[in-house]
Regions:
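Active-site PLP attachment segment
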Residues: 197, 202, 211-246
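Structural motif of enzymes handling amino- and sulfur-group chemistry
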Residues: 259-276, 287, 296
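Conserved PLP-anchoring active-site segment centered on the Schiff-base-forming lysine
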Residues: 97-116
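PLP-dependent enzyme catalytic core of the Aspartate aminotransferase-like
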Residues: 40, 66, 77, 331-332, ...
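Conserved PLP-binding catalytic core of the aspartate aminotransferase-like
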Residues: 36, 282-292, 296-333, 343, ...
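Active-site phosphate-binding strand-loop segment of PLP-dependent enzymes
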Residues: 32, 130, 134-186
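N-terminal "arm"/small-domain region of PLP-dependent enzymes with the aminotransferase-like
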Residues: 1-53, 182
Length: 381
């Protein structure tokens, strides 16, 4: 039952991969939701930038490349915030901002299904941590009442939850946090550039779940990733200029690490206007609706609501059965990883499907057929 690293080589400009030597496998594990890692214009710009010499330094020494500043300005426009700060990864962005804003005199209220980077940031901060049941606003209010004597309070959640594919109850969280004079922090790595207002200005279109739910201005701290909606690499924090300056001077996860290389900044800068056009999101949600409907018709137990997001968890329950299901799918040319404890709760092992805008209908139909075949053999259906 120990985890094992599979050897995965993604095929060029396709949604297939070679997995442990098995070729032409349909890849349903990628977080490249809009398929931009294959975009030729982005790749050409990155290749040109690779000819430049990287500073190979932290930003406070010699690594503050002009392209990083350009990227941060574009991301601030995208999020409609005063400023942003780019980190090497989304994981480090969460650790950096939480450990900077919270200390032993702070209480953090955290959704029980928050990502490991949020959990780790909370623990490292030394704050008093109160965990509330997933999206349970009644319990969140009760916890706030119990900690009313604490001066500094932060409520942190994901926008789109990475293992369940459902959306945070951000409207209620923002209301409660405002009443309690608490900071609201949202990690929207999986919703950024996928969800949002399609009618917004070009720079802020698809700026994530907060925008989608109409509470963007009520969020104090946004964190996100450049490796999902943009298909690039890196992470960032979007907030006020004051918080940006605080992070530059206090965040160990920013100060003591090398800066994001120029070619990755150029890739993200090139990807932003492509990602915000809207045509790729339409293709993605067409695939989501089709996949969710067909899997439901098979009788599989799916988490989340119909067509709610690009993350579709097929709940198996038993860990060994989930691992065997994944193995048999791979034998059938379908790559879907089994996710189990401690990533998810015991007894809730699942197959986590990640859809992209590049998946063809024939590929999805083939995957659905394989789910049906394997599900019947394992008596899941």
């Amino acid at each position: 039952m120990y985890r094992r690293l599979k050897l995965v080589s993604v095929e060029k400009r396709t949604t297939t991969a070679t997995v442990d030597g098995k070729e032409n496998v349909i890849n349903l594990c990628s977080n490249d939701y809009l398929g931009l890692s294959h975009n030729q214009n982005i790749l050409k710009r990155a290749i040109i930038s690779l000819k430049q010499i990287s500073q190979c330094s932290s930003r406070l020494i010699a690594g503050n490349d002009p392209k990083l500043i350009n990227l941060e300005e574009k991301l601030a426009e995208h999020c409609e915030t005063e400023s942003t700060l780019v980190y090497p990864t989304g994981y480090m962005a969460n650790l950096g901002v939480i450990t900077t804003l919270a200390d032993k005199n702070t209480t953090i209220l955290s959704d029980e299904l928050n990502h490991a980077s949020i959990v780790d940031g909370c623990r490292l901060s030394g704050a008093n941590i109160q965990v509330f049941r997933h999206n349970d606003m009644e319990q969140l209010e009760h916890l706030f009442e119990a900690i009313s004597c604490w001066r500094k309070k932060i409520v942190v959640t994901e926008g789109l939850f990475s293992m369940d594919g459902d959306i945070s109850n951000l409207q209620q969280i923002c209301r409660i946090a405002k009443e309690q004079n608490a900071i609201t922090a949202v990690d929207d790595a999986h919703g950024d550039f996928i969800f949002g207002e399609a009618s917004a200005s070009s720079s802020s279109r698809f700026s994530g779940i907060p925008s989608y739910l109409g509470v963007n201005n009520d969020i104090d701290v946004h964190t996100s990733s450049l490796s999902k909606g943009l298909g690039c690499f890196g992470g960032y924090v979007a907030s006020t200029r004051q918080i940006r300056e605080l992070l530059i001077n206090k965040s160990r996860h920013f100060i003591y690490t090398s800066a994001l290389p120029e070619h990755l900044c150029v890739s993200a800068l090139t990807a932003i206007p492509i990602a915000t056009k809207g045509n790729l999101q339409k293709k993605l949600f067409d695939n989501i609706d089709f996949m969710f409907r067909k899997l439901s018709q098979l009788g599989l137990r799916l988490a989340g609501k119909s067509g709610s997001s690009q993350i579709i968890p097929v709940i198996i329950g038993d860990e060994k059965t989930a691992i065997e299901f994944s193995k048999r799918l791979l034998d059938n040319g379908i790559f879907v990883q089994a996710v189990r404890y401690p990533t998810v709760k015991k007894g809730s092992a699942r197959l986590r499907i990640s859809l992209t805008a590049r998946h063809g209908r024939n590929q999805l139909s083939s995957a659905i057929d394989s789910f049906g075949t394997v599900g019947k053999k394992l008596i899941i259906i």
